[in-house]
Amino acid sequence: METLITISRWLAKQHVVTWCVQQEGELWCANAFYLFDAQKVAFYILTEEKTRHAQMSGPQAAVAGTVNGQPKTVALIRGVQFKGEIRRLEGEESDLARQAYNRRFPVARMLSAPVWEIRLDEIKFTDNTLGFGKKMIWLRDSGTEQA
């Protein structure tokens, strides 16, 4: 649990996620501001359905991605690599996620883009501030944590 708490605290301080999807052998990546839900271990993002990445995702798809800062030295590198599943939210689930997203990013109130959830199933957190190459791993299905 300690690993997930550490990762969640770091993710809560960031705000841009890069995620990638594939369809019929074609890969595509995108960036978005995100809201992180530590209880569900999921990102919430807004993106229009007409975008290439949304079209490739369909209602639900496998996803992989990263969250990272922009440090000036190797010793300060911190970042997450993940894999999971992206899906478009509907109904009350979408409404609740949008309310939380709008609290974090008030400018989003002007956007009508659908809300998507990226559920994280595997997370690898690299934190060179704890020592070069220090990694922490969390897996949803097994509840496994490695430091």
From Swiss-Prot:
- What's the superkingdom here? Bacteria
The cross-references to SUPFAM superfamilies, in alphabetical order and at most eight, read: FMN-binding split barrel
Name the family the entry cites: Belongs to the UPF0306 family.
Q: Which HAMAP family match?
A: UPF0306
Any idea what this protein is called? Answer: UPF0306 protein YhbP
Query: What is the originating organism of this protein?
Result: Shigella sonnei (strain Ss046)
Lineage, uppermost ranks: Bacteria, Pseudomonadati, Pseudomonadota, Gammaproteobacteria, Enterobacterales
User: Which gene is annotated as encoding this protein in its UniProt record?
Assistant: yhbP
